């Protein structure tokens, strides 16, 4: 009888250990990230998320990045509020090359009149030429086309080219952007929006700026600051200067959040702004069956 009792006790202990091992394995499987490419998305700065000056790196090949409604709110010194919203999706279509589609939306106050609607269709291609070396920064080129789609869009299409450089040191990264936009000035003042929203909403003849950021890998977040100047499409307007700062945080292996604030230092739209956005990284294996 004693032997039987001991055997039952040993069987119970073995069963408990097996259940514990199974539960632990299941928990690890559930908690393990399924999309490794999204784990460092906080480290890659995109235009408008949360600053306009971006780095020279692109979305991984065969990976998608869904930018979930990056929002920018501006308040001018005159008390007018402007909203910018541009949902985007990017695809790493080739090695070191991404394509991106965005639909900028605008909510503006002009002369006491509120207007809202689609401000265009933004198509872009970005290519990263190289990884950084001891003597050469990472370099990239982006080409954009803003199509005249929507009731708040310009009356013609605009194309632009942007050169990007990124240099990394042990204590910080530095980025330099320079952009030029081709095309005549808009015929209507409403189309020549000076709303400095994410992406296509900030249409200017030229743009030049620099940014610095610092990453904290153990906490999965990054802080950044920028300063840039932009010349409006209207040649009669002076160059506008803006300073801003922000942060990006990796909430999960596939989801990153960002936020920032800053101030336009001069110009007719002088005032402050805040931004908030998120990005979800994922892949669709069925679309790329041969990818590894």
Spans of features found by a protein language model:
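N-terminal secretory signal peptides that target proteins for export/translocation
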Residues: 1-15
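Compositionally biased, intrinsically disordered low-complexity regions
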Residues: 12, 19, 280-282
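Sec-dependent signal peptide recognition
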Residues: 7-8, 17-25
